[in-house]
Amino acid sequence: ETLMDTRTATAELGWTANPPSGWEEVSGYDENLNTIRTYQVCNVFEPNQNNWLLTTFINRRGAHRIYTEMRFTVRDCSSLPNVPGSCKETFNLYYYETDSVIATKKSAFWTEAPYLKVDTIAADESFSQVDFGGRLMKGXXXXXXXXXXXXXXXXXXXXXXXXXXXXXXXXXFFKKCPSVVQNFAIFPETMTGAESTSLVTARGTCIPNAEEVDVPIKLYCNGDGEWMVPIGRCTCKAGYEPENNVACRACPAGTFKASQGAGLCARCPPNSRSSAEASPLCACRNGYFRADLDPPTAACTSVPSGPRNVISIVNETSIILEWNPPRETGGRDDVTYNIVCKKCRADRRACSRCDDNVEFVPRQLGLTETRVFISSLWAHTPYTFEIQAVNGVSNKSPFPPQHVSVNITTNQAAPSTVPIMHQVSATMRSITLSWPQPEQPNGIILDYELRYYEKLSRICTPDVSGTVGSRPAADHNEYNSSVARSQTNTARLEGLRPGMVYVVQVRARTVAGYGKYSGKMCFQTLTDDDYKSELREQLPLIAGSAAAGVVFIVSLVAISIVCSRKRAYSKEVVYSDKLQHYSTGRGSPGMKIYIDPFTYEDPNEAVREFAKEIDVSFVKIEEVIGAGEFGEVYKGRLKLPGKREIYVAIKTLKAGYSEKQRRDFLSEASIMGQFDHPNIIRLEGVVTKSRPVMIITEFMENGALDSFLRQNDGQFTVIQLVGMLRGIAAGMKYLAEMNYVHRDLAARNILVNSNLVCKVSDFGLSRYLQDDTSDPTYTSSLGGKIPVRWTAPEAIAYRKFTSASDVWSYGIVMWEVMSFGERPYWDMSNQDVINAIEQDYRLPPPMDCPAALHQLMLDCWQKDRNTRPRLAEIVNTLDKMIRNPASLKTVATITAVPSQPLLDRSIPDFTAFTSVEDWLSAVKMSQYRDNFLSAGFTSLQLVAQMTSEDLLRIGVTLAGHQKKILNSIQSMRVQMSQSPTSMA
């Protein structure tokens, strides 16, 4: 950059000459005939010449190195005549650094001392007189460089000693590297260094919309004002592309650039868009998504449609599901499948997630195949399976995965394995064993089969001592096994040899057959020495017991005499009522006898003795499922330490209760806690140390038997219904053996679990303690509440409740089961029911009821309670029916029992009906009213012509309902043919 150039001057230069007669400023012309200002001197003929010429003040403007360029002419000394020997053809160039003006016309210093010599200037060519005469300046050019340190300016001085010279032009300038954009970084103009070899570092900054890649960003400026050695660089950031390598331009709408770099903007991938400039990413359109691992350059994809064409193959309690892939994969190739399993109630109105026991092969989630095998399901249970199709973007969608559902109901299956056996006692010749019910009975357990044999070696396994062992090695005696059967979960193996080890296995049987045998367990009979030792240990106890027995008998005789005398004067009904709860019948030897909690002076003591206290923190209440006498009933979960979580039913005592109500509420737990039978509802425990007070029992998925049967009218076979009745009878037999009288046996008080196992429940006494006139089921009688339709006549008339009166109630339950939950005695009043029974009328057989079952009902309804069958006999009779299903094929009719008058409700009087609605109501099929009317069957004449195909067409699909309606239509036709004009 030029600091001074005399060629551009249009006025006097104003330099300082010394002496004044030395250098003279004159005008001249350059080679191009341009006017220029020059200085000349030629005092060669005068001695001692020392002519100085000093430039004006030159501002260096930060330059570290200043260059001077001079154009001049020098006279050839030889062309001058008589020139003295001091004539020279050179002159000297000096410079001086200063911060201010150092010379004027009046003052200056003219010695070499303060100046720094740049060079002695000599011309390449000197000129003669002729050349110089035309004032056309031709001459030589000389360039010199001077380094400037810290001063702000410099002055140049030319000293001519006895020379004839003219300074045609003088220029001072410096070099710099210009501002430049390189590698998308801008570098400022930079002065060269003080030395010609200097490299000056210049820091760069990224241009707008560019970002550093390598740091630091710098260039080097060399002494010639040239950039060199680039280090570091910038590139255009995401959303911008390079333009001519000097700028970063925003990506237009509809394009994007995902990352920093030299790449160009690209069009948005399919199913995406960018509505603004400089987009680093194209947003997916509605309904389309990117997976977390999808690059921005990938197309947006959607979720798959649901699987298609599901095929289900049910095999007892397992199922195979197969399906076709979805029609739409969403544009992806990572489709997998999830299986959602839901276990439902019989009416499918409520479903819940399957428990963790259900097994899926190969897996439940993330299936890549279109097939899954599902096992360990419950028998006779409706299930809904959802097959979800998912892909890499399904988790991005706000909607649940597309799926296809399939409803299935599992079949009857054999029971699961009995988990373990325990030895109750042993003698020299026998072993008494017990075992829990299989975890999955898959129906009603009919009986158990035990297989046992004598082990040749007395050693079972090294880690087993005493009575219980695990699987022993194979034994040749195994092929000579003996078999025993038991109708309960206890058995006594007799006829054994003393001191021998026996290997025992057990399996359960339902109507579906036998389950698998349990693992082999080892048990040992007593040796003669063992028996004698045990006898010696028990002898003092036996003697003491005998003595106590004598005292007890004497006391009992004395008490009996006193009580018999008092009985003549006492008519206390309540006491005798309580007494019958535990003093009826005779218990078997060694059988535990029921103890009435109301005989305790402190009823809370009975609760503590018979019911386990549960910490409320182990209980989780989920939803209300009903209401009881004392409060609401909930479904919940119970997780006891060391045990798996189970569903439970939770009865609560409402707030504001009295102490009497609390005692009455907990009395049911005191009763239930004494029972342990697979057909009796199981008490888990009570919560009495916090509020609300709770009774916790096992949860029965299908609820009360009467409503369950009504919901599944016609859906069960006769053998299944008999299996249910057998379970109820087994539970009642157990209660009778405990000397407990239920008093309120009815289908509404039988609960059904998911395996169709029926369990007797409702042991509360609230109905005797509260007079709720809103419930017509119970009628006041002698100060108590009695369910008339289910109660034996002697109990209604005299409050004589015994196990025999429970047998009468059991006969009514049989009728309820075989009629699929119909109300006993239909819409007759309680008084009409009492009158009919007194006149020896009995209920007729339900539709399609086997004659053998109806006969058993009639046996239960014998007026003389002593002639009714015992509950043990009923269990045996039902077992025979189950073993011989052919005995159930004969269907009972009203005319088949001429000796017993029956209430006749099987053929209603159709002449009394005025509409189809009345007729449907009479046959308990009102739910099909709209089906009949919308299909055009608006009169009884049209209904009488209907066929089974017509019923299917209008939506009557249940086989039991079809049969009931067709039987009624057949009877209607008979009455119409007998009285053709009697019906409108």
Swiss-Prot record:
Keywords: ATP-binding, Cell adhesion, Cell membrane, Cell projection, Endosome, Glycoprotein, Kinase, Membrane, Neurogenesis, Nucleotide-binding, Phosphoprotein, Receptor, Repeat, Transferase, Transmembrane, Transmembrane helix, Tyrosine-protein kinase
GO-annotated cellular components: dendrite; early endosome membrane; plasma membrane; receptor complex
InterPro entries to which the protein is assigned, alphabetical: Eph_TM, EphB1_SAM, Ephrin_rcpt_lig-bd_dom, Ephrin_rcpt_TKs, FN3_dom, FN3_sf, Galactose-bd-like_sf, Growth_fac_rcpt_cys_sf
Reaction catalysed by this enzyme: L-tyrosyl-[protein] + ATP = O-phospho-L-tyrosyl-[protein] + ADP + H(+)
Glycan attachment points: 315, 407, 480
Chain sites annotated for binding ATP: 625-633, 651
Domain called Eph LBD: residue spans: 1-182
Subunit relationships: Heterotetramer upon binding of the ligand. The heterotetramer is composed of an ephrin dimer and a receptor dimer. Oligomerization is probably required to induce biological responses.
Active-site residue list: 744 (proton acceptor)
Keyword Glycoprotein among record annotations: yes
Protein name, UniProt field: Ephrin type-B receptor 1
Keyword NADP attributed: no
Enzyme class name: transferase
Source superkingdom: Eukaryota
Gene Ontology terms for molecular function: ATP binding; transmembrane receptor protein tyrosine kinase activity; transmembrane-ephrin receptor activity
Ranges spanned by the short sequence motif PDZ-binding, renumbered to the chain: 982-984
Tissues where the protein occurs: Expressed at high levels in the 10-day embryo, and in adult brain, lung, heart and skeletal muscle. Low levels of expression detected in all other adult tissues tested.
Regions of this protein lying in the Cytoplasmic compartment: 563-984
GO biological process entries: axon guidance; cell chemotaxis; cell surface receptor protein tyrosine kinase signaling pathway; cell-substrate adhesion; dendritic spine development; dendritic spine morphogenesis; ephrin receptor signaling pathway; establishment of cell polarity
Membrane topology: Single-pass type I membrane protein
Protein kinase domain segment(s): 619-882
Family to which this protein belongs: Belongs to the protein kinase superfamily. Tyr protein kinase family. Ephrin receptor subfamily.
Compartments, record wording: Cell membrane; Early endosome membrane; Cell projection, Dendrite
E.C. designation(s): 2.7.10.1
Domain SAM: 911-975
